[in-house]
């Protein structure tokens, strides 16, 4: 959880009876055999359940857009690509990609296409957008789906919910989400010293609270049984206000997680803790170091383990004037006024916090560290907007627009092991954003969204917008 929110305090079986039919023993034997086979297939399918896949879709040829593939290479002007059954099946330049028989053609001349975003750090389900209240009572399937729809609206294809999930719901949702909204991945319950993880009361009890190595290992074992996507730990004393998870415990967590082939990502604040976590085998950081600028020793520890990643999660800020119009697409007008007031006041602490982390991010990026993308969204912040604000912050910190886009697409998909996502390339899931202008020229152009496609289906943004803000059009 970030030190402040993006806006501070913003708030069926069908039974048919049939007459008996006389069958021979041979016939009944065949029937029993077939039923047995069907049961085996059904059980196997259930055990290997994956997120829902799109229904069969006809081919569509998209032509004329500038294409940013997500691999960091120069964009392709006047591109052409074919989407069929939820995947990119051919990508190239207009004139070299033929129109498949029976396919539709969509002209994107003047537009820019880029991969949909991947958010590696969210806390969904607690914030009720209508009431502007955070509460554990809001952690329902309906609210989680609403949050994922807001992600889809803003061009986010998948998110990792990082350590504050409860009960069976997150795992059910992980298996159920797919082509209709953003993919949901979960770290389940995180691990911290008791009552020393997230700040707020409404989710302080969500993580495991551990005091001994045995408790720490047991928590990891329970998470491993749920096949979580990551293990999240908090190593932070909140400016001396709570006990910090000690090295003996986080080393036990990392060791046990690795024994179960799980990776561990840390919420961290202090440079000294970051160094020791790297020595202990941490797999990634959910925030940048915040007390000091990183030094050569820290960079060297990172470079010695090139698979370790950083999610910068840059300091929060209130939305500026240009953001308010973007936010008004998905929020009712009565919520915009207090945001405008917050924006006018600004945050006196942000320049110092941002400068420290920006310099560190620039140095780590130059050193070749794996830079991912995350927002900490859900802590009362406008869902979806946070991703576009983070992209702008990363560029403000010194990354080029192309580098920020790679971090938010291909690299984050790789970190989350979503191998079929994060790029516009043959065989990949057709998750992409159509923009009215190029973010390579101005990163804030990621907000100029003309359309979003997930698994080849266009998200009905007008319908979603009308339901949230009462506005059916921009």
Identify the residue ranges that each predicted region occupies.
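Histidine/acidic-residue-rich catalytic or RNA/ligand-binding cores of hydrolases
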Residues: 129-132, 171, 244, 274-280, ...
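Glycine-enriched alpha-helix->loop->beta-strand junction motifs that scaffold or abut catalytic
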Residues: 278-285, 304-309, 368-369
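His/Asp/Glu-enriched, well-ordered alpha-helical/loop segment
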Residues: 259, 342-344, 348-438
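Bacterial N-terminal signal peptides
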Residues: 33-44
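Acidic, glycine-enriched loop/beta-strand segments at the rims
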Residues: 51-53, 67-80, 92-96, 382, ...
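Mature N-terminal segment immediately following signal peptide/propeptide cleavage
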Residues: 55-90, 108-115, 119-124
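Divalent-metal coordination cores built from histidine and acidic residues
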Residues: 108-237, 241-264, 297-343
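Divalent metal-coordination and catalytic microenvironments
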Residues: 65, 81, 86, 110, ...
């Amino acid at each position: 959880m970030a030190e402040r929110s993006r806006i501070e305090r913003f708030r069926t079986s069908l039974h048919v009876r049939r007459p008996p039919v006389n069958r021979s023993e041979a016939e009944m034997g065949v029937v029993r055999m077939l039923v047995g086979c069907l049961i085996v297939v059904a059980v196997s399918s259930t055990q290997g359940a994956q997120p829902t896949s799109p229904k069969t879709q006809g081919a569509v040829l998209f032509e004329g857009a500038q294409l940013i593939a997500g691999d960091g290479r120069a964009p392709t002007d006047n591109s052409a690509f074919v989407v069929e059954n939820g995947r990119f099946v051919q990508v190239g330049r207009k004139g070299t990609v033929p129109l498949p028989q029976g396919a539709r053609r969509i002209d994107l001349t003047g537009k820019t296409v880029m991969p949909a975003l991947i958010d590696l750090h969210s806390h969904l389900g607690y914030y009720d957008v209508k009431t502007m209240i955070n509460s554990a009572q809001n952690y329902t399937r309906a609210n989680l789906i609403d949050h994922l729809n807001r992600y889809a609206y803003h061009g986010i294809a998948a998110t990792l919910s990082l350590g504050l999930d409860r009960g069976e719901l997150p795992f059910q949702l992980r298996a159920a989400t797919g082509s209709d909204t953003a993919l949901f991945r979960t770290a389940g319950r995180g691990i911290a010293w008791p009552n020393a993880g997230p700040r707020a009361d409404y989710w302080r009890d969500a993580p495991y609270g551990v005091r001994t190595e045995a408790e720490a290992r047991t928590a990891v074992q329970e998470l491993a049984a749920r096949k979580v996507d990551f293990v999240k730990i908090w190593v932070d004393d909140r400016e001396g206000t709570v006990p910090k998870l000690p090295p003996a415990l986080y080393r036990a967590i990392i060791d046990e997680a690795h024994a179960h082939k799980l990776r561990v990502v840390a919420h961290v604040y202090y440079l000294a803790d970051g160094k020791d976590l790297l020595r202990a085998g941490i797999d990634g950081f959910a925030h940048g170091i915040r007390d000091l600028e990183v030094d050569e020793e820290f960079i060297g520890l990172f470079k010695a383990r090139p698979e370790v990643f950083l999610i910068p999660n840059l300091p929060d800020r209130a939305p500026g004037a240009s953001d308010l119009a973007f936010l008004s697409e998905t929020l009712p007008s009565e919520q915009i006024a207090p945001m405008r007031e917050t924006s006018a006041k600004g945050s006196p602490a942000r320049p110092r916090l941002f400068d420290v982390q920006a310099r560190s991010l620039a140095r780590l990026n130059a050193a070749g560290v794996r830079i991912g993308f995350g927002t900490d969204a859900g802590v009362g912040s406008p869902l979806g907007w946070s991703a576009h604000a983070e992209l702008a912050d990363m560029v403000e910190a010194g990354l080029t627009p192309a580098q920020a886009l790679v971090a938010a697409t291909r690299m984050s998909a790789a970190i989350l092991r979503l191998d079929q996502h994060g790029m516009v390339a043959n065989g990949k899931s057709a998750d992409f954003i159509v923009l009215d202008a190029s973010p390579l020229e101005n990163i804030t152009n990621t907000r100029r969204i003309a359309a979003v496609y997930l698994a080849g289906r266009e998200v009905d943004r007008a319908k979603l917008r009308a339901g949230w803000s009462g506005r059916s059009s921009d």
